[in-house]
Amino acid sequence: MSKKIINEVIDILEDKKYTYTMIEYPEHNRKSVDIVLNSKEPTLIRVSEDKVTKEEISDLKKIAVSTLTASLVVTNEEEEDIVSVKADNVFAVSPEGFKKVINGEKIFLYRTRGGIFIKIRNYILKHKREEMGYSIGDVAKFLGVSRKAIYDYEKGDSDVSLEVAEKLIDLFGDDIIGDVIWDSIKGKKEVIEEDITEFSPESFKSKLIYKLKENGLNILSLKLTAADLIVKDNENNRYLVTIENKDYNKSMKKFYEAKKLSSYTKSELLIIIRTSKMLKECEDLGYKTYEENDIHSLIDEIKGSNGRQS
């Protein structure tokens, strides 16, 4: 984590009086979440001076999609007015771009492997087209694109080039232009979990995932933050599960940071304990704990839940 960029990010947040928490686990390795911002919806922030890894992006995507929010990667690699879309709900911005996001300014340009596009508000496009009496064919002819392209625009399956955006503004006005981040949040799309065969059969985490899935629970595995799993039941209640590791001090740190993450993402934290010493300590601290040889109790807890906010 770049100290220079993180200080810029913190200055921006404190200037706007946002509340936030720093996630300080793992301490000496790469991690996927540096800051959780408590805005209207919790926002995850990863600060990086270089490229983020696939595993970091994977964690950010899973947490963001499961919590119906955004993950922002703040890096000097991005241009001020352009967002880079890394995955569903994961967006990379420059420190200047991050300031615009926090100030509520609209950022409508984004970059993908296919080029630079402008975000449009598909529902406004359809409403205005129908209100003004244009057929799909009329708009397609005016823009110089296919009828299928207009269908895709109106369904939100495709955005537009700079040239097409200018023509749309001429026809329908500039309120048709959207915000790359907040108009792109996806919540209903399922994030497909890795195949269980990708994990080591000797791994406790792998066995746990298998048992949870066997009981009809939806599981997402995290690799570079304080929580090990995101678990959702059929009623969409959300849990963060974290597992004790071999080092006592690191485990205590991990649990503390996972508690912060669960609080800001409105999830319930469940801790799996592997030693008797840790069990007593965690119970004294008020953590909800389960022993590794008593996973059925954890499953009963999750499947028996109802009415909790997700």
Curated annotation (Swiss-Prot):
Portion annotated as DNA-binding: 136-155
Entry annotated with the keyword Transmembrane: no
Example of a GO MF term: DNA-binding transcription factor activity
Top-level taxon: Archaea
Residues of the signal peptide: none
Every HTH cro/C1-type domain range: 125-180
Pfam entry (one): HTH_3
Record key words, sorted: DNA-binding, Transcription, Transcription regulation
Cell cycle as UniProt keyword: no
CDD domains in alphabetical order: HTH_XRE
HAMAP family: HTH_type_cro_C1 (MF_00584)
Protein name per the record: Putative HTH-type transcriptional regulatory protein YG5714_1269
